[in-house]
Amino acid sequence: MKAKDFDYYLPEELIAQHPLEKRDECRLMVLDKETGHVEHKVFKDILDYLNKGDCLVLNDTRVMPARLIGEKEETKGKMEFLLLKRTDKDTWETLVKPGKRAKIGSRFIFGQGELKAEVIGMAEEGSRIVKFEYDGIFEEVLDRLGQMPLPPYITEKLEDKEKYQTVYSKESGSAAAPTAGLHFTEELLNKIKEKGIKIVFLTLHVGLGTFRPVKEGEIENHIMHSEYYCISKETADIINTTKEAGGRVIAVGTTSCRTLETLGSKHGKIIEDSGWTNIFMYPGYEFKVTDALITNFHLPQSTLIMLVSALSERERVLNAYEIAVREKYRFFSFGDAMFVK
């Protein structure tokens, strides 16, 4: 299959630039994965589509303020650092701009000098391995000095950092939010529990590769980025029990879905586990664990729209996207939601 088979027309004004004031009042498109039938709802109506005995799987990762603005020690030239993933205690794979100023041995200063960095190696696709020096706890220093690494298509400034976190975020480590989870409020989660639906958590730290378009002509040749995941025994047991009892396992977001399918493909069921996954799902993939998916509207030709197309069917998904454009849904990270059931 070709990447262009997953293309669609999107007017720029439909790319949401800011989150809604009330998380659960965004629009919700409900797509029947077998028939392609579409319904238009509000997100809090998701409650009507969840049944007692179902299990909702959420990703509790927390976005790091991973964008650092600093200067080169020698020249005082302005530099931008974007932390991608931790490779050791104080060492990170990092995107550095402008890259030509970031040679091995180059040193940089952030804030009033409370954070320093040195490039100690080169990594794939032009990123650098950077070692940081600081006093105290790195996460606290980052909280003071760092900015939220918003996707490139969001050009407006985010006034409140917490708007780019889910209400249940806990485990810091992501370079982007698991955006399907942004629509849930504490109140909605409580109502879901009261209805007899199990809510469980896993962790997958979202990397910037999630925004990378598929450049290869044939999608089968695309090399997927790796992301770290972790799942507890308690979560694994509840998911397996749900499947055995005939309930649905509903992934909240493509990140939860990727973790579930990684484990299903490796072990045939969900077990306590942690590691790295580069699973790539596109039409023809047979789902092992995920029965339904809550997700946002994704970029044309992205691996994420391919994943959704694998769960339903390419034509059905592209037709639903065409309807969403016509009905002026809001797209991408701060946009509206879709429930593929």
UniProtKB/Swiss-Prot annotation:
Pathway(s) the chain acts in: tRNA modification; tRNA-queuosine biosynthesis
InterPro entries per the UniProt record, alphabetical: QueA (IPR003699), QueA_dom1 (IPR042118), QueA_dom2 (IPR042119), QueA_sf (IPR036100)
Parts of the chain that traverse the membrane: none
Gene3D superfamilies: QueA-like
A GO term for molecular function: S-adenosylmethionine:tRNA ribosyltransferase-isomerase activity
Localization (cell): Cytoplasm
Record keyword Lyase present: no
Keyword Calcium recorded: no
Keywords: Cytoplasm, Queuosine biosynthesis, S-adenosyl-L-methionine, Transferase
Reactions this protein catalyses: 7-aminomethyl-7-carbaguanosine(34) in tRNA + S-adenosyl-L-methionine = epoxyqueuosine(34) in tRNA + adenine + L-methionine + 2 H(+)
UniProt-listed Enzyme Commission number(s): 2.4.99.17
Superkingdom field: Bacteria
Main location as per UniProt: cytoplasm
Subunit structure: Monomer.
Role: Transfers and isomerizes the ribose moiety from AdoMet to the 7-aminomethyl group of 7-deazaguanine (preQ1-tRNA) to give epoxyqueuosine (oQ-tRNA).
Family affiliation: Belongs to the QueA family.
HAMAP family: QueA
Protein name: S-adenosylmethionine:tRNA ribosyltransferase-isomerase
Species for this entry: Clostridium tetani (strain Massachusetts / E88)
